[in-house]
Amino acid sequence: MYGRSNAPGCQPPVRAHPPSSPMTSRLQLAAMEQNASDAALSGMQQARSRQASPKRLRDLIPSSDVESMSLNALDDAYGHHDFSVWFEDLMPPEMELLMPTTDAKLNYLSFTRRLASSVFHSPDNRMPGGACDHTSALDARKERFATIINKFLDLHQILHDA
């Protein structure tokens, strides 16, 4: 079906039949499936080996070195390695039910930080009488704390002058 080339080292092209072709034998199908499963297994084994032994700073640097050495000395001693970034999950277990993925947790933290910032910097919370109940309660506590501290400072000044 294909013409031969006279050039040295050239081989005629091989016509491959798709797996669904009636020309493909069962042995060829089995060999292709085996090759695909071998490739998938080797990829999974490589991923497991990377996950099984990540290099983390806490595993490599002893705590005595962290406490006793300066940052430059630590960099000189351990800075030539590549390390995995490791995030500690500090969310309460109850929140794990509501937000099982890391993306959901990060979105929640981002949203609550933006919400707190917008509440804090909103003009209504800066005007007396326009604040919400929570802001009013916090402002009352701040004022009470300030008056108590001022009384202690006044007492200290009186005792110091006497």
Curated annotation (Swiss-Prot):
Q: Enumerate composition-biased segments (Polar residues).
A: 43-52
Q: Per the UniProt entry, what are the Gene Ontology biological process annotations, in alphabetical order?
A: viral DNA genome packaging
Its principal location?
A: host cell
Checking InterPro entries in the record gives: Herpes_TT2
Does the record bear Heme in its keywords?
no
Q: Which GO terms describe its cellular component?
A: host cell nucleus
UniProt keyword list: Host nucleus, Viral genome packaging, Viral release from host cell
Q: Highest taxon of the source?
A: Viruses
The region called Disordered is annotated at: 1-58
Q: What is the annotated localization of this protein?
A: Host nucleus
Quaternary arrangement and interactors, per the entry? Associates with TRM1 and TRM3 to form the tripartite terminase complex.
Similarity remark: Belongs to the herpesviridae TRM2 protein family.
Protein function = Component of the molecular motor that translocates viral genomic DNA in empty capsid during DNA packaging. Forms a tripartite terminase complex together with TRM1 and TRM3 in the host cytoplasm. Once the complex reaches the host nucleus, it interacts with the capsid portal vertex. This portal forms a ring in which genomic DNA is translocated into the capsid.
Q: Which HAMAP family match?
A: HSV_TRM2 (MF_04015)
Its name, as the record gives it, is Tripartite terminase subunit 2
Q: Name its species.
A: Equine herpesvirus 1 (strain Ab4p) (EHV-1)
